Curated annotation (Swiss-Prot):
Protein name: Transcriptional regulator MraZ
GO biological process, one term: negative regulation of DNA-templated transcription initiation
Primary localisation category: cytoplasm
Domain SpoVT-AbrB: 5-47, 76-119
Organism: Clavibacter michiganensis subsp. michiganensis (strain NCPPB 382)
Amino acid sequence: MFLGTHSPRLDDKGRLILPAKFRDELEGGVVMTRGQDRCIYVFTTREFEELHDRMRQAPLASKQARDYMRVFLSGANAETPDKQHRITIPQALRTYAGLDRELAVIGAGSRVEIWDAGTWDEYLTANESAFADTAEEVIPGLF
């Protein structure tokens, strides 16, 4: 499970060093793709394959399902971390997420999310006040 917030920097070649706490789980390979809220989702290869299997259950007759899968899967990129535990984020994904050098890499349970640090700070500021108020509504019986 991925937890916590980390602050690596993007180098000139579009690479970031994976946080130490995430390395063991991600060393076998990752799949990066567009996430909601202009971030990048990073899945283990296994988790992405399971997610894709669930997506394949959606009816092809559904335009919404087709549209979602096209956007989600067309942005996907498989990558294996190098010996220095770095992954290269493709330019298209860096542009999508508006990444600058300063990043926020967060653990989101079954996935990692890569955010531009400024965008992450804005997101937290906008959403922290509603955090306590929405817990019961979003996940009934959680607390």
